[in-house]
Amino acid sequence: MVVVANAQELSGQDNPEVQRVEPFQVFDNLYYVGGKWVAAWLLETDQGLILFDSLYGDLTDLVIDGIRELGFDPDDVRYIIITHAHYDHIGGARRFQEEFGSVV
């Protein structure tokens, strides 16, 4: 018998329960809202919130939940800055656009 598995599936990279990290304040107005293997950062400004990267798929829920756990409202995410064009960093951007009106 031959078993072929996707290494990403085996590692739990797509599983929000495995990837969950308690969101935390890094310093001043910068917060971590990402997962264990891919980062997302939230910057609080006078103009609203700026999110750096949005994760993807179910992991985008980690970002949204983290924003709420820190006492912020995802509706206040005005801008999303994508650090680079890998799917794990950009996949949730459309969701933020559609649900919260964020500008990418």
Regions found by a protein language model. Give the residues of each.
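Boundary at the C-terminal end of the N-terminal hydrophobic targeting segment
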Residues: 5-12
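Conserved beta-strand hairpin/beta-sheet module of binuclear metal-dependent hydrolase folds
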Residues: 16-74
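Active-site metal-binding motif and surrounding structural segment of the metallo-beta-lactamase
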Residues: 47, 59-104
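Intrinsically disordered, low-complexity N-terminal regions enriched in serine/proline/glycine
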Residues: 5, 30-31, 78
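Sec-dependent N-terminal signal peptides
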Residues: 1-2
